[in-house]
Amino acid sequence: RQQACLEERRELEQLSDLAEIEKQLDKASGELKSLGLSLRAKRHQTADRFSANVNTLLPALGMPKAKLSLEFEAIEAHAHGIDRVNFLWQAHAGAQARLLAKTASGGELSRIALAISTASAQSNPTPTLIFDEADAGVGGAVGQAIGELMRDLGQTRQVLCVTHLPQVASQAHQQFKVLKREQDGLTYSDVQTLDTQDRIEEIARMLGGKEISTTTRLAAKEMLKLKG
């Protein structure tokens, strides 16, 4: 009889523990929901301002009619809140806004990333930004704007950029040249740091091709003088 009483007591204690656990779980769920709603409100407060700041930069980057917007999709609570934040991209006037990741080209993505990084420069702690041919498919004037934005970002963080445009390369604080060579049947890539004279030669080559003339050298010197 005593053993039966002890077992019954243990069962009651387990039920009591379960009730306490459920109580704590309900409390935690309530706190999670409250925090999620607070985060949602803050995101909605900043979304329009953020997208507007990004959109003001797009014309200079060769996308005059494009628009970036944010959409919030309610989902089950997770580490980043109770919403999924979707970036929507409208490439030109009259186009339907679609998911950025599935719509924008590689070159557009790099330029959009540059616009986002510039718009959020004060609040973004990322120490290193990498842009792979953000100038793909654009001309000199847009390339100049891209280079100037990257140079501005480079004042507060490290910015690495792969580029084929002299207007972008001339804006860099430091320039490197990547060379490929073959040795013993294998291909190697070498990275060469360029000094001032090397930069003049390389930018002149980017301007004029294989044959570098006095005119292209003078143009390269002028571009380096005019950087930020």
Outline where the language-model segments fall.
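Extended, charged alpha-helical coiled-coil/arm scaffolds that mediate oligomerization and mechanical coupling
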Residues: R1-L61, K65
